[in-house]
């Protein structure tokens, strides 16, 4: 959750393979490329005022590679041999082998409060408002319905270069819909302002109604040159019935969109 949990470094979206110090003010990559040391800013703090220290970084890393977290993290950081706290504000990550991107990938680790998570299971749902390292804290929520975030007035990094022009909303609310049909009807009723549709059937059949007729909702295709997936029917032509091209064409004619 980027609203609540900060990272050691901040990636630059318009500079490939670049990152800037955020919680960490610098890192030093060893000459042999087999370790990297991060140095944490003295003024980096959690939402409760506790300073962020190397033990929090170590705890966050160990938690995310544990069996309680999603396996993707263990795969993502598989080349990390160990993490060692050097002192209160510095931590070293050692590698099994050279990896030209690993020192940047480590910078993406979200930092949790070790004190807050103490005694809690990461694999279970925790219905408490956590201590955050990011710009927002939880103001209110209802399980399965919504969560509302409030900007932390004491956010430590508001004037950091890595946060220039960002996080300008005082309140951000996420509403949860049990399926896309419900979500689309909520959109058509005006509960939110924009929807990105990627389902051809819904696009052809369901985007209609009074607000469309009144031009209060604009249905528009925005063409782009980005890579995108495909939607369609893939016929198994090893089966006799699908080997005839006319049969495949006939099946497509059965759909009115």
PLM features: what roles do these ranges have?
Residues 12-15, 106-166, 170-171, 178-182:
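Gly/Pro-rich hinge or "lid" segments in bacterial periplasmic/extracellular proteins
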Residues 1, 20-23, 50, 72-73, ...:
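A structural "hinge/loop" feature
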Residues 64, 82-84, 139-150, 175-239, ...:
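Extracellular/periplasmic solute-recognition and catalytic clefts
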Residues 26-70, 86, 92, 177, ...:
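Aromatic- and charge-enriched surface segment that lines or borders ligand/interaction sites
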Residues 9-13, 45, 62-69, 100, ...:
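Sec-exported extracytoplasmic/periplasmic mature domains
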């Amino acid at each position: 959750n980027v609203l609540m949990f900060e990272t050691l470094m901040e990636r630059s979206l318009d500079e490939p393979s670049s990152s800037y110090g955020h919680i960490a003010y610098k890192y030093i990559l060893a000459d042999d490329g087999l370790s990297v040391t991060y140095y944490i800013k003295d003024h980096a703090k959690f939402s409760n005022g506790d300073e962020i220290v190397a033990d929090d970084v170590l705890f966050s890393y160990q938690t995310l590679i544990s069996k309680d977290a999603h396996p993707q993290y263990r795969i993502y950081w598989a080349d990390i041999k160990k993490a060692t706290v050097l002192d209160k504000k510095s931590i070293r990550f050692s590698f099994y082998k050279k990896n030209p991107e690993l020192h940047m990938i480590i910078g993406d680790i979200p930092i949790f409060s070790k004190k807050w998570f103490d005694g809690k299971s990461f694999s279970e749902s925790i219905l408490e408002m956590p201590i955050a390292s990011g710009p927002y804290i939880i103001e209110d929520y209802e399980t399965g319905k919504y969560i509302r975030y409030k900007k932390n007035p004491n956010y430590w990094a508001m004037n950091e270069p890595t946060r220039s022009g960002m996080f300008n909303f005082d309140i951000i609310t996420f509403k949860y819909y049990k399926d896309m049909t419900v979500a689309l009807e909520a959109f058509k009723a005006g509960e939110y302002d924009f929807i990105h549709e990627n389902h051809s059937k819904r696009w052809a059949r369901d985007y209609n109604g009074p607000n469309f007729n009144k031009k209060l909702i604009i249905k528009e295709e925005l063409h782009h040159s980005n890579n995108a997936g495909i939607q369609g029917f893939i016929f198994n032509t090893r089966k006799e019935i699908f080997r005839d091209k006319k049969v495949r064409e006939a099946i497509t004619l059965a759909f009115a969109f």
